[in-house]
UniProtKB/Swiss-Prot annotation:
Name assigned to this protein: DNA primase DnaG
Keywords: DNA replication, DNA-directed RNA polymerase, Exosome, Magnesium, Metal-binding, Nucleotidyltransferase, Primosome, Transcription, Transferase
Phylogenetic placement of the source organism: Archaea, Methanobacteriati, Methanobacteriota, Methanomada group, Methanopyri
Cofactor note: Binds two Mg(2+) per subunit.
Keyword Metal-binding: yes
Species whose genome carries this gene: Methanopyrus kandleri (strain AV19 / DSM 6324 / JCM 9639 / NBRC 100938)
Length: 409
């Protein structure tokens, strides 16, 4: 281990959660670890279950350092994380829910969340300086250009503030703005010459963003991970967003190159199209303004009242498939089911068709979204019998001959 560096045993570690612990009695490390796993179970759902995260390597080994003072125990809990910022913050908050260790009352308080990548960047800059010093004796006429490029790469751009939020200088005057997650995202876009950018700084969208969205064209530019989805969900609920742009899958806006940023913004889609893709209705503008739509007058009918159409009776298999759909509600994901209608794989909606094409033995596809023509065609090719979704898109009767389409309605 190098001097001044901590080895967390996982090269993918992005953050380290540090929390202090106090217990009103004598406890040992196994008691603490057991309490953490036991009392956080079920708090964050299956995807962020600590045992599952540890097993898959998304968090590292939980380190506990304890000392006993006058019959009480104090110490430190250290949790390395390769999750994104939002998920890491959720795990940290879950640690604070531990209130009992063994027979003793206890209290856990998160002290800090360290950004390991910041430490790596600082080491990289120090090493770059050393390399440049070693090259001084070999300076060529072009070396000044090299020095300038290295300086530009490590220089921090000036991030301004708009009503307390990190922002570029053109936010107030521009007719259109780009909304990102954090300060680092703003800095990265400023380096690329994009100055009409502002950050929400968390999942609670500030009032300043809501007000700006009422008078400007808004593009939400989010990370290509679960954290980005959460930010986008919150934005769409409270702000008037016009376009949606996403970083490549698994990447954060703050780490994108100029070329990747340009490509992502060029591929932005209208919010109505995005909502259609994930199976949600665009907001009704009349309802947003508080106006109730006028009820349509229906002509009076004489004679016997018309009978309501009865919903088709569902067979046991269909009911079982619709139950699977209810479990997926709000996840923007899809499941592949085998011959026994048991789940074999779960995928993101944006990679559903490609994953289906490479998967064998799938009998049913259940998705929290719209059933599209492209999906049904892929299902026919793979011999899928059922496709189950929130609603049906514009489908030709011809392509539905070999695949049974099931929706909630």
């Amino acid at each position: 281990m190098s001097k001044g560096r901590t080895d967390y045993g996982n090269g993918a570690v992005k953050y380290v959660i540090r929390a202090k612990l106090r217990a009103n009695g004598y406890v040992e490390r196994p008691d603490v670890v057991g309490a953490i796993f036991g009392q956080t179970e079920g708090l964050l759902g299956d995807d962020l279950d600590l045992r599952r995260l540890l097993k898959t390597g998304r968090i590292g080994r939980i380190d506990v350092k304890l000392r006993n003072e006058n019959g009480k125990t104090v110490g430190e809990i250290i949790v390395p994380s390769s999750l994104d910022r939002v998920e890491t913050a959720l795990v940290a908050a879950a640690l604070e829910q531990v209130d009992r260790i063994g027979p003793c009352r206890a209290e856990v308080e998160v002290v800090s969340i360290d950004d390991i990548r910041k430490e790596k960047r600082e080491r990289m800059i120090r090493r770059a300086r050393e390399i440049l010093r070693e090259m001084v004796s070999e300076v060529t006429p072009d070396s000044s250009e090299l020095v300038q490029k290295v300086k530009e790469a490590v220089e921090d751009v000036e991030v301004e503030e708009y009503k307390g939020l990190p922002a570029g200088p053109n936010v107030e005057d521009s007719d259109a703005i780009i909304v990102v997650e954090g300060r680092a995202d703003v800095a990265n876009l400023l380096r690329c010459g994009i100055k009409n950018v502002i950050a929400v700084e968390g999942t609670n969208v500030p009032e300043a963003i809501v007000e700006l969205s009422k008078e400007k064209t808004v593009t939400a530019f989010v990370d290509g991970d679960r954290g980005g989805e959460l930010i986008l969900k919150e934005l769409l609920q409270v702000a008037d967003v016009d376009y949606v742009a996403k970083a490549p899958k698994g990447k954060e806006v703050e780490e994108l190159t100029r070329k990747e940023i340009k490509r992502a913004l060029e591929r932005k889609v209208p919010v109505e199209e995005y909502l259609k893709e994930i199976g949600e209705r665009p907001k009704d503008k009349e309802r947003e303004k508080g106006k109730k739509p006028k009820p349509k007058k229906r002509p009076e009918r004489r004679g016997r009242p018309r009978k309501k159409k009865a919903r088709p009776k569902r067979g046991p298999q269909e009911r079982r498939l619709l139950d699977r759909l209810k479990r997926l509600k709000g996840t923007f994901r899809a499941e592949f089911l085998d011959e026994g209608l048991k789940p074999v794989k779960e995928v993101e909606l944006d990679e559903l068709v490609e994953k289906l094409k490479s998967e064998d033995g799938v009998r049913a596809v259940v998705l929290d979204g719209v059933i599209t023509r492209r999906l049904v065609e892929a299902a026919r090719e793979k011999g899928v019998k059922y496709v189950v979704g929130v609603k049906e898109g514009d489908l030709d009767p011809e392509i539905k001959k070999d695949v049974k389409i099931i929706t909630m309605s």
